[in-house]
């Protein structure tokens, strides 16, 4: 859905939005761009980014970090394996960027708190962010939702940590 939304927003402003094809190949010649940006990519194809950047060109991206809103996932699905909780760690992005021949200029991660003050907000969120609890429906999780409603009513907001990281990389001259 993000490509369609970005296109609808940016095309009227004269900004083309281009998505990689299924094999992550970007439809551009080598050394085409001074800057490549992305926000919340599903996957970062570092070799392709390095290929399309001109020498000295940069890549800037904000990405979802590890275990983002993991508390919410685990509330509905139970404990997740360490391999799942550790996915999308900025150290992995740094290593992959370097392996593609890029220099990492800056890498920083922030952890924020997301508070759900009522169960309706949880339902809305899980319907929009479908990968947090795959296959989520009110019917399937009615019991857990009722328990969560009671928990929020008696103890206050359900809080989940949200992690994001910013990475800036540069193709050497």
Which residues does each predicted region cover?
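Conserved class I S-adenosyl-L-methionine
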Residues: 58-89
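Residues lining the SAM
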Residues: 34, 39-40, 62
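A short glycine-rich, Lys/Arg-flanked "PGG" loop and its adjoining helix->strand segment in the class I
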Residues: 44-60
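A short acidic, Gly/Pro-enriched loop at the edge of an enzyme's catalytic core
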Residues: 23-35
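Acceptor-substrate binding/catalytic loop of class I
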Residues: 78-92, 110, 131-136
């Amino acid at each position: 859905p993000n490509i369609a939304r970005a296109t609808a927003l940016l095309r009227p402003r004269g900004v083309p939005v281009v998505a990689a094809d299924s094999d992550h190949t970007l439809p551009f010649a080598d050394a085409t761009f001074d800057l490549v940006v992305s926000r919340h990519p599903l996957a970062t194809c570092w070799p392709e980014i390095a290929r399309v950047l001109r020498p000295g060109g940069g890549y800037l991206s904000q990405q979802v970090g590890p275990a983002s809103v993991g508390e919410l996932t685990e509330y509905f699905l139970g404990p997740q394996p360490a391999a799942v909780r550790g996915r999308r760690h900025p150290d992995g992005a740094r290593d992959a960027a370097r392996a593609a021949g890029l220099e990492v200029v800056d890498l920083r991660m922030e952890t924020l708190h997301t508070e759900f003050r009522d169960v309706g907000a949880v339902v809305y969120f899980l319907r929009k962010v479908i990968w947090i609890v795959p296959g989520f429906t009110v019917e399937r999780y009615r019991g857990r939702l009722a328990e969560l409603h009671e928990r929020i009513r008696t103890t206050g907001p359900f809080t989940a940590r949200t992690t994001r990281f910013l990475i800036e990389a540069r193709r050497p001259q």
